[in-house]
């Protein structure tokens, strides 16, 4: 079973991944981008290109880099562990949502090509209201994506639901302002139903 934890930056995805590790020690935990060796380099390039390398990526170049990472992630992580519980910090859903200026049908087709049809069995979307998102974003330094602003992040948050609906995937939306243990319990409840 393949579970994707989704949400905008600062919503608590990484926190939930850490909490879930205690409950599912046999599971394979991964992340996108960066779940493979090449993915770490791609992630660094996309997130820090303006500050570290002095240029901004074209949106199509960014999409293609994420697709390359996703293809490698499929080959190195998803396919070899397809019979195990896989829990991922982000997935194809983020890839499509963040490429919102690209036609969604085209983006879905490109991602389906690199994933060979292997999609999450459950997508957990951690959602923040504008006030909470603003507070969390202001309390940390920004990478290239986060520096696009609150309005951009809220648009992306809406895109997550649109993407899972378009792809006909099973998903739940959880209020990310709740206590982290409560959120973890809700995620576990849904995983345990499907495992």
From Swiss-Prot:
Q: Which UniProt keywords apply?
A: ATP-binding, Kinase, Nucleotide biosynthesis, Nucleotide-binding, Transferase
UniProt EC number: 2.7.4.9
Catalytic activity reads: dTMP + ATP = dTDP + ADP
Question: Would I find NADP among this entry's keywords?
Answer: no
* Protein residues bound to ATP: 7-14
Question: Which EC class is this protein assigned?
Answer: transferase
Kindly give the Gene3D superfamilies that the UniProt entry links to this protein. Answer: P-loop containing nucleotide triphosphate hydrolases
- InterPro entries from the UniProt entry: P-loop_NTPase (IPR027417), Thymidylate_kin-like_dom (IPR039430), Thymidylate_kinase (IPR018094)
* Cross-referenced Pfam families: Thymidylate_kin (PF02223)
What are the annotated GO cellular component locations? cytosol
Gene Ontology MF annotations: ATP binding; dTMP kinase activity
Record-level GO BP terms? dTDP biosynthetic process; dTTP biosynthetic process; dUDP biosynthetic process
Which HAMAP family does the entry link to?
Thymidylate_kinase
- Which family is this protein grouped under? Belongs to the thymidylate kinase family.
Write out the function statement from the record: Phosphorylation of dTMP to form dTDP in both de novo and salvage pathways of dTTP synthesis.
- Quote the protein name from its UniProt record: Thymidylate kinase
Instruction: Provide the species name.
Output: Helicobacter hepaticus (strain ATCC 51449 / 3B1)
